[in-house]
Amino acid sequence: MEIFDLTIHELHEKLKAKEVSSVEATRAMLDRIEAVDSQVNAYITVTPEQALVQAEDADRRIAAGEIAPLTGIPVGLKDIFVTKGIRTTCGSRILENFVPPYDGTAVAKLKEQGAVIVGKLNQDEFAMGSSNESSYFGPCKNPWDLSCTPGGSSGGSAAAIAARTATATLGTDTGGSIRQPASHCGCVGLKPTYGRVSRYGVIAYASSLDQVGPLTRDVTDSALLLGAVAGYDPMDSTSVNTPVPDYVASLAKGVKGIKIGLPKQYFIEGLDPDVKRAMDEAIAMYKSLGADIREVSLPNTEYAVATYYIIATAEASANLARYDGVRFGHRAEDARGLAQMYSKSRAEGFGPEVKRRIMLGTYALSSGYYDAYYVKAQKVRTLIQQDFLNAFKEVDVLLTPIAPTPAFKIAEKLEDPLQMYLSDIFTIPVNLAGTCGISVPAGFSAAGLPIGLQLVGKPFGEQEILTAAYSFERETQWHLKKAPL
């Protein structure tokens, strides 16, 4: 097994035993990126010089006996996290040359532990997309089948795990942007409860929905990485001040006697037969492990996609107003006057999907439509949140598909934005409810593409979903399969 194949906890043990140094592990990862990333396009920016300096520092820490779970581990970051001295583009032309003067909180926490940041990962522009095709830096490809998308918007973060060009990565999830690519690329992706991880230093798409989370090779790594980045941050007013439990300690508790709910609105006509088979096998597996399986109802699910695309686009229209060519980002060269500079800079800097969403959001917030769309969507969001709280009075965890189909072909849905939007139908409600969800590898389609299983927990119920995911992973071993790169 190569160094780049190892999980966080496996590499940690080797670093601790001094069987390998962080510099060796980092060099191995940088060589792997050079060897395969031209096929995958998971990275927008690779940072070999900074990474090797960080690796040398990690080796000094290890020699001094100061080793944390992430010390010396090569990590990739979605290019939505601001990184001091490292270009941060958010997948957009408008930020093509933006170099931030500070680190976001999640990045700072990784650096505190001595993690090594090897680069910034490809994504849909401003995290708006489900396929990584809206990136100004070209589409990222799925390592399991290079003609398919890796999912999105954290496509590069998932593809780097599958291609073994990062030991672990961080992404963000606004409507499924960690869980859906994790499912399509056969890795573990966790969206924590809203407020569990600081959003300070995350370029905003939809501020009431965005949440930072880990993408990893297995559930133990997910628990380790979440533990490293979670916690209260006074710099983020939506961060919640509750203690961070030891997520790893409770992994092996098992699922005997836990109540798992199957929302009937999620097991619908039109589910891909391979996805349905994987879900049926997962349900049977949990039954055999002693879980109590029962049907539950989330009656407002049918309104979730419409609700999301009003709230998210409205927030995006406000958040993206700051990109006007004045203080940072792309500025049009030949503008005559201020108004033309604003409009030309934005017209040149934003891609078509971002423009579409800004227009949708501006329309939903405009006078005469605000009550009919935005206010109504917020009311429906409250009903969706209540659906989840009602379901969690009866069960501990919900089990659902992640996506209606496995990964789709590049360009297959580009002509029909509505089809693309519907690919997040099973993940969006979790963001609207503000609770937590995890994607775990659950099998493969007939074409050999990965299929993920979603486990949804109560607000701040990350321990329960990690435990349930770990029990499933231990029995199935799907996570050990490797993409043929």
UniProtKB/Swiss-Prot annotation:
Keywords, alphabetical: ATP-binding, Ligase, Nucleotide-binding, Protein biosynthesis
Active-site positions on this chain: K78, S153, S177
GO BP terms, alphabetized: translation
MF GO annotations: ATP binding; glutaminyl-tRNA synthase (glutamine-hydrolyzing) activity
Entry EC number(s): 6.3.5.7
Keyword Protein biosynthesis: yes
Entry keyword annotation includes Flavoprotein: no
PROSITE patterns found in the cross-reference section: AMIDASES (PS00571)
Cellular component terms (Gene Ontology): glutamyl-tRNA(Gln) amidotransferase complex
Family: Belongs to the amidase family. GatA subfamily.
PANTHER family assigned to the protein according to its UniProt record, in alphabetical order: GLUTAMYL-TRNA(GLN) AMIDOTRANSFERASE SUBUNIT A, TRANSAMIDASE
Function summary: Allows the formation of correctly charged Gln-tRNA(Gln) through the transamidation of misacylated Glu-tRNA(Gln) in organisms which lack glutaminyl-tRNA synthetase. The reaction takes place in the presence of glutamine and ATP through an activated gamma-phospho-Glu-tRNA(Gln).
Quaternary structure and partners: Heterotrimer of A, B and C subunits.
Protein name: Glutamyl-tRNA(Gln) amidotransferase subunit A
Record organism: Citrifermentans bemidjiense (strain ATCC BAA-1014 / DSM 16622 / JCM 12645 / Bem) (Geobacter bemidjiensis)
Taxonomy of the source species: Bacteria, Pseudomonadati, Thermodesulfobacteriota, Desulfuromonadia, Geobacterales
